[in-house]
C-alpha cells in the first residue's frame, strides 16, 4: 500500500516538474519572507543597541566546533568522490543540486526559527552537512539515468520512489526521534545541536520527496539529445540498478527500525507530557525571564552604514577557526576539480569496462549521418564468416578477438571513463581488451546459455556462432538487430547469411551498411535491413516563393533534372518570384462496408449525410487524436457495398496511420447504430492511395496547392532560350491535347513526377505516393502590355506530404527538411510545416515545367540529355550477371 502511494507521488512529481519546482521554491521563499516582514525591525548592532548576556565561551568549544566543520567538509568531499567513481557528470550535477537546495531550505528554516539571528546558522551548518546522505539521492538518479526515453524516466523515478520512499521515510523518522532525545537533556548547547539536527533531517526529507525528483526529471528532459535512439545521459552500467535496489531493503532492519521508532515515541510522550514539571511553575519562570528582559530595554541608535554593508562586514570578518575551515574547503575543491580526474580514471581502468562502459557521444558531422556507438566493435578478422559476404564457413575462427576502443579521430566509437562528452582526448584514455574464443564454433546449447546470460550476451559469441543459431532456428533472422549488442552487427550478420543464398556471393560488396543510425530505422522505416542505398542529392535554387528564397534538395539518379529545375528557379527569380496558396488540406481514407441489402446500405448512406449522423461519427473520429479532425464524408454505393471516404486534417503528419485509426473507431461507432453492418476493409480503394484515381484529381487528397509566376519576355529569350509564343504552343498541344488523347488522369503536365519524387526521396516522404501527388495541370498564357511575357501556373490537387513520422525521422532526411525550414512539427500552428513543404513542391514543379517546356520549344532536349544524361562508360568492357553466367 505504501509503495503504491509513493509510486503515485513519484509519478506525479516527475510528470509535473515545473509546477513542483516552482511550488517548492515559492513555499521556501514564503517561509523566509513571512518571518522577515512580520517580525520586529530591530537589528542588533545596526539600529539598536541590544542587551548582551555574557556567556563563558570556552576555547574547547571553539576547537570542537572547528573540528566539526572540518569533518563535515571532509564528509561531503568523500561523498562526491564516491559519486565520481560512477563516471557520470549528471550524477554529480544532480547531487550537487540536491545539496545546494537542501542547504537553502535548511538555512531558511534556521533563520525563521531563530528570528533572523544568523549566528545560529553558523553553528548549524556543520551538523546539516554531516546529516546529508547522497546515497539515496544518487540511487534515485540512477533509476532515472537507466532510462531510454523521457516517458521511461518518469516511470523509473516513480519506481525508485516506490522502492526508496518508504525506507527513507522510516529512516528520517527514526533519525528525528533519536536526535530529538537530546532536546530533552536540559543542556542548552546539546539541545540546540539536536534541534538543528532534527531540522536538517526534515529539510533533507522535504527536498528528496519534492524538489529533487522533479529536478532530475526536468534536467534529463532538457539535456536529452538522441544518439542511436538513446539519450546522451543513458549509462549502460546503470541498467541493473532496478533489480539491485529492489532487493536492498532488509525486512529485519525495517522491523527493528519500526520497533525503535515506537519506543522512542513512547519516550518522547512520557518526557514531554507525563513527566513534565508543573506548567504553572514554568509559566511563572518564563514570565520572570520576560520581565527581566523587558527591564533592560534596547536603545535605538542611528545606523552608521547601510544594512547591506552591515551584513557584508559581518560576513567578511572571520575568526581563526573560520579561516581554517575555508582553507580546508578551498584545498579540497582544488584537489577535486584539478587532480581528482586522473586518479579516478586510473582507478576505473582496473575495472571491467565491458560491464560498465560510458559511451562518449560526439557531435554529428555536417552531413548529419551520425555514427552509431558500438559497444563492441569486431576486427576485420572477427570470425569464420567475413564482414563482406561470399566467404566459406569452413575457415577457422581467429583465437583472439580484440575489442578495440579508439580515440575521437578514429572511425569507431570512443569509451571515456570518468569524464563528460566534452573531455579532451588526453583525458579520454583508451584501452584494448581481448576476449578469447575457441577456434571452432561451440555447441548450440552452450551458445544459447551465453546469449541469454546477463553478464555476457551476444558480444561473447562469434559471428559464426550467431549464424549457427539462426540456421538452427534458435534466433529469428528478423530479430538480429535487437539481440546483438549493436544494430550494425545484426545487419552485418544478416548480410553474411544472405550472401550464401545469392547467385553471386559478392553481390552486396558495394552496398554500404556501416556507420548508419539503424535505431531510427527499426520499427519505423524498414525490416530485414541489409544496408542503405546512397542516392546523389542535388540542390536547385534559390526558389523565390512567396517572398522567401529556398534551396530545394532533390535526390535523383536522372541527369539534367536538377540542372533543368535550377534553370527554372533562376527564371522565376528574375521574374520577381512565384506566389502560392494552399486551397485545401485533408487526408482521406475510404473503407468499404457491407449490409444485407442495398436498401439497408441506402439507409446508412442517408443517415451519414444528416447533420446528426455526421456529428456522431465526427465525435468518435476526433477522439482518437489531438490533430485528426473530420472535415467531411463522401459516401457512395455499389450494390449493397457502401464506400465511405473520410477526409480529415492531420497536422504536420502525412496522416495515413492517424486517419486509419480514426476511421476504425468511427466504423465501430457506426456499427452500434447498424449492427447488421459488416466491415470488409478499412481501406476499400476509395481513398485512393498510391493508385491513379479520378477522385483524387477531382476531390483532392492531402494538400491542394496552386502556384503562379510571370516570366518577363527578356528572361524567356535570354535564360530559357525561346519565345513566349512557342512555349504556349507546345504546352497546349503537348500537356493539354496530348494528355487528353492518351486518356490521362491528372497528367496534364510535362514531368511533375520527376520533381515530386526527387523531393520526396530527399525529404523522407513515401516515394510510392508520387502516383497521386504528381497530379498536376500546367497552364501557360501570354501576359504583359505587349503579350510577350509568359504567365505560368501549376495546380496540384493531391500532394500527400508530411514533416513528421516515417522517413522524416531519419537524420539525412531531417537535414534536407531543415534546409527548407520545415523539419518536424510546427508548434505555433500545427500543420503549417507540411503545408509550406507542399507549396515548395508545387513551386519547384513549376520551375521544372518551365525549363523542360522551354527546352522542348527550343529543340534542346535531346542535345542536353546526350551531354548530361548519358553514361560515358563502355558497357562492352563490363560483364553483367547474365553475360557472366552465359560465358
Swiss-Prot record:
GO BP: any one term: coenzyme A metabolic process
UniProt keyword Nucleotide-binding present: no
Protein name per UniProt: 3-hydroxy-3-methylglutaryl-coenzyme A reductase
Motif INSIG-binding motif, residue range(s) on this chain: 75-78
Gene: HMGCR
GO cellular component, one term: endoplasmic reticulum membrane
Subunit structure: Homotetramer. Homodimer. Interacts (via its SSD) with INSIG1; the interaction, accelerated by sterols, leads to the recruitment of HMGCR to AMFR/gp78 for its ubiquitination by the sterol-mediated ERAD pathway. Interacts with UBIAD1.
Result, substituting residue 871 to A: Abolishes phosphorylation by AMPK. Blocks inhibition of sterol synthesis induced by ATP depletion
Key words, A-Z: Cholesterol biosynthesis, Cholesterol metabolism, Endoplasmic reticulum, Glycoprotein, Isopeptide bond, Lipid biosynthesis, Lipid metabolism, Membrane, NADP, Oxidoreductase, Peroxisome, Phosphoprotein, Steroid biosynthesis, Steroid metabolism, Sterol biosynthesis, Sterol metabolism, Transmembrane, Transmembrane helix, Ubl conjugation
Family to which this protein belongs: Belongs to the HMG-CoA reductase family.
Catalyzed reactions: (R)-mevalonate + 2 NADP(+) + CoA = (3S)-3-hydroxy-3-methylglutaryl-CoA + 2 NADPH + 2 H(+)
Site of covalent link Glycyl lysine isopeptide (Lys-Gly) (interchain with G-Cter in ubiquitin): 89, 248
EC category: oxidoreductase
Highest taxon above the source species: Eukaryota
Activity control note: Regulated by a negative feedback mechanism through sterols and non-sterol metabolites derived from mevalonate. Phosphorylation at Ser-871 down-regulates the catalytic activity.
Domain SSD: 61-218
Enzyme Commission numbers on file: 1.1.1.34
Spans within the Cytoplasmic topological domain: 1-9, 79-89, 150-159, 221-248, 340-887
Its biological purpose: Catalyzes the conversion of (3S)-hydroxy-3-methylglutaryl-CoA (HMG-CoA) to mevalonic acid, the rate-limiting step in the synthesis of cholesterol and other isoprenoids, thus plays a critical role in cellular cholesterol homeostasis.
Modification comment: N-glycosylated. Glycosylated with high mannose chains including Man(6)(GlcNAc)(2), Man(7)(GlcNAc)(2) and Man(8)(GlcNAc)(2). Deglycosylated by NGLY1 on release from the endoplasmic reticulum (ER) in a sterol-mediated manner. Undergoes sterol-mediated ubiquitination and ER-associated degradation (ERAD). Accumulation of sterols in the endoplasmic reticulum (ER) membrane, triggers binding of the reductase to the ER membrane protein INSIG1 or INSIG2. The INSIG1 binding leads to the recruitment of the ubiquitin ligase, AMFR/gp78, RNF139 or RNF145, initiating ubiquitination of the reductase. The ubiquitinated reductase is then extracted from the ER membrane and delivered to cytosolic 26S proteosomes by a mechanism probably mediated by the ATPase Valosin-containing protein VCP/p97.
Membrane topology: Multi-pass membrane protein
Entry annotated with the keyword Endoplasmic reticulum: yes
Modification Phosphoserine, positions: 871
Compartments where found: Endoplasmic reticulum membrane; Peroxisome membrane
Amino acid at each position: 500500500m505504501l509503495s503504491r502511494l509513493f509510486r503515485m507521488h513519484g509519478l506525479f512529481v516527475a510528470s509535473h516538474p515545473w509546477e513542483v519546482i516552482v511550488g517548492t521554491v515559492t513555499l521556501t521563499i514564503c517561509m523566509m519572507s513571512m518571518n522577515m516582514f512580520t517580525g520586529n525591525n530591530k537589528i542588533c548592532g545596526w539600529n539598536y543597541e541590544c542587551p548582551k548576556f555574557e556567556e563563558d565561551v570556552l576555547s574547547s568549544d571553539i576547537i570542537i566546533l572547528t573540528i566539526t566543520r572540518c569533518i563535515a567538509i571532509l564528509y561531503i568531499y568523500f561523498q562526491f568522490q564516491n559519486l565520481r567513481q560512477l563516471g557520470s557528470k549528471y550524477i554529480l550535477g544532480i547531487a550537487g543540486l540536491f545539496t545546494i537546495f537542501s542547504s537553502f531550505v535548511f538555512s531558511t528554516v534556521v533563520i525563521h526559527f531563530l528570528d533572523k539571528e544568523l549566528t545560529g546558522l553558523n553553528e548549524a551548518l556543520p551538523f546539516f552537512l554531516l546529516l546529508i546522505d547522497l546515497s539515496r539521492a544518487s540511487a534515485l538518479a540512477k533509476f532515472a539515468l537507466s532510462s531510454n526515453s523521457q516517458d521511461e524516466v518518469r516511470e523509473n523515478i516513480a519506481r525508485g520512489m516506490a522502492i526508496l520512499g518508504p525506507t527513507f521515510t522510516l529512516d528520517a523518522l527514526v533519525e528525528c526521534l533519536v536526535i530529538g532525545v537530546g532536546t530533552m537533556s536540559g543542556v542548552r548547547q546539546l539541545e540546540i545541536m539536536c534541534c538543528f539536527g532534527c531540522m536538517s533531517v526534515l529539510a533533507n526529507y522535504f527536498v528528496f520527496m519534492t524538489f529533487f525528483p522533479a529536478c532530475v526529471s526536468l534536467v534529463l528532459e532538457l539535456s536529452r539529445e538522441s544518439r542511436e535512439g538513446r539519450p546522451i545521459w543513458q549509462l549502460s552500467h546503470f541498467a541493473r540498478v532496478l533489480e539491485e535496489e529492489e532487493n536492498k531493503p532488509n525486512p529485519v532492519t525495517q522491523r527493528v527500525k519500526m520497533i525503535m521508532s515506537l519506543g522512542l515515541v513512547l519516550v518522547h510522550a512520557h518526557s514531554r507530557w507525563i513527566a513534565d514539571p508543573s506548567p504553572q511553575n514554568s509559566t511563572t519562570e518564563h514570565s520572570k525571564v520576560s520581565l527581566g528582559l523587558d527591564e533592560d530595554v534596547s536603545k535605538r541608535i542611528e545606523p552608521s552604514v547601510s544594512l547591506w554593508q552591515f551584513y557584508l562586514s559581518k560576513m567578511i570578518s572571520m575568526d581563526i577557526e573560520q579561516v581554517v575551515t575555508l582553507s580546508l574547503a578551498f584545498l579540497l575543491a582544488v584537489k577535486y576539480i584539478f587532480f581528482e580526474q586522473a586518479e579516478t580514471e586510473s582507478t576505473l581502468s582496473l575495472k571491467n569496462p565491458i560491464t560498465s562502459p560510458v559511451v562518449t557521444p560526439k557531435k554529428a558531422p555536417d552531413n548529419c549521418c551520425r555514427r552509431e556507438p558500438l559497444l563492441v566493435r569486431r576486427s576485420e578478422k572477427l570470425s569464420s564468416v567475413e564482414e563482406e559476404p561470399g566467404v566459406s564457413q569452413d575457415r577457422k575462427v581467429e583465437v583472439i578477438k580484440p575489442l578495440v576502443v579508439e580515440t575521437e579521430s578514429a572511425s569507431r566509437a570512443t569509451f571515456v571513463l570518468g569524464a563528460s562528452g566534452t573531455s579532451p582526448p588526453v583525458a579520454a584514455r583508451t584501452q584494448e581488451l581481448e576476449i578469447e574464443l575457441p577456434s571452432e564454433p561451440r555447441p548450440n546449447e552452450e551458445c544459447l546459455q551465453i546469449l541469454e546470460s546477463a553478464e555476457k550476451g551476444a558480444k561473447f559469441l562469434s559471428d559464426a556462432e550467431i549464424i549457427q543459431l539462426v540456421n538452427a532456428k534458435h534466433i529469428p533472422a528478423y530479430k538480429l538487430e535487437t539481440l546483438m549488442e549493436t544494430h550494425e552487427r545484426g545487419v552485418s550478420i544478416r548480410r553474411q547469411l544472405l550472401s550464401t543464398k545469392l547467385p553471386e556471393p559478392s553481390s552486396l560488396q558495394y552496398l554500404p551498411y556501416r556507420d548508419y543510425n539503424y535505431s531510427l530505422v527499426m520499427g519505423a522505416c524498414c525490416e530485414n535491413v541489409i544496408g542503405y542505398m546512397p542516392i546523389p542529392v542535388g540542390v536547385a535554387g534559390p526558389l523565390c516563393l512567396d517572398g522567401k528564397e529556398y534551396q530545394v534538395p532533390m535526390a535523383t539518379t536522372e541527369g539534367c533534372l536538377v540542372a533543368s529545375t535550377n534553370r527554372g528557379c533562376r527564371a522565376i527569380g528574375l521574374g520577381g518570384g512565384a506566389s502560392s496558396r494552399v486551397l485545401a488540406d485533408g487526408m482521406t481514407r475510404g473503407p468499404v462496408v457491407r449490409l444485407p441489402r442495398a436498401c439497408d446500405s441506402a439507409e446508412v448512406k442517408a443517415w451519414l449525410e444528416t447533420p446528426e449522423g455526421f456529428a456522431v461519427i465526427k465525435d468518435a473520429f476526433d477522439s482518437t487524436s489531438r490533430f485528426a479532425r473530420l472535415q467531411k464524408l463522401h459516401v457512395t454505393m455499389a450494390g449493397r457495398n457502401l464506400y465511405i471516404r473520410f477526409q480529415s486534417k492531420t497536422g504536420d503528419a502525412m496522416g495515413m496511420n492517424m486517419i486509419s485509426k480514426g476511421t476504425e473507431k468511427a466504423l465501430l461507432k457506426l456499427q452500434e447504430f447498424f449492427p447488421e453492418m459488416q466491415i470488409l476493409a478499412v481501406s476499400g480503394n476509395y481513398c485512393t492511395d498510391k493508385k491513379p484515381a479520378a477522385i483524387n484529381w477531382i476531390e483532392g487528397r492531402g494538400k491542394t496547392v496552386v502556384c503562379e509566376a510571370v516570366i518577363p519576355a527578356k528572361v524567356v529569350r535570354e535564360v530559357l532560350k525561346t519565345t513566349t509564343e512557342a512555349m504556349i504552343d507546345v504546352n497546349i498541344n503537348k500537356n493539354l491535347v496530348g494528355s487528353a488523347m492518351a486518356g490521362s488522369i491528372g497528367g496534364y503536365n510535362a514531368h511533375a513526377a520527376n520533381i515530386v519524387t526527387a523531393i520526396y526521396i530527399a525529404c523522407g516522404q513515401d516515394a510510392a505516393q508520387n502516383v497521386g501527388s504528381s497530379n498536376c495541370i500546367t497552364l501557360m498564357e501570354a501576359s504583359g502590355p505587349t503579350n510577350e511575357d509568359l504567365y505560368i501556373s501549376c495546380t496540384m490537387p493531391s500532394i500527400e506530404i508530411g514533416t513528421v513520422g516515417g522517413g522524416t525521422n531519419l537524420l539525412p532526411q531531417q537535414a534536407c527538411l531543415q534546409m527548407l525550414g520545415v523539419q518536424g512539427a510546427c508548434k505555433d500552428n500545427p500543420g503549417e510545416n507540411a503545408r509550406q513543404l507542399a507549396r515548395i513542391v508545387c513551386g519547384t514543379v513549376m520551375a521544372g515545367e518551365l525549363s523542360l517546356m522551354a527546352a522542348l520549344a527550343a529543340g534542346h532536349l535531346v542535345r542536353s540529355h546526350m551531354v548530361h544524361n548519358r553514361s560515358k562508360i563502355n558497357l562492352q568492357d563490363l560483364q553483367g550477371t547474365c553475360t557472366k553466367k552465359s560465358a
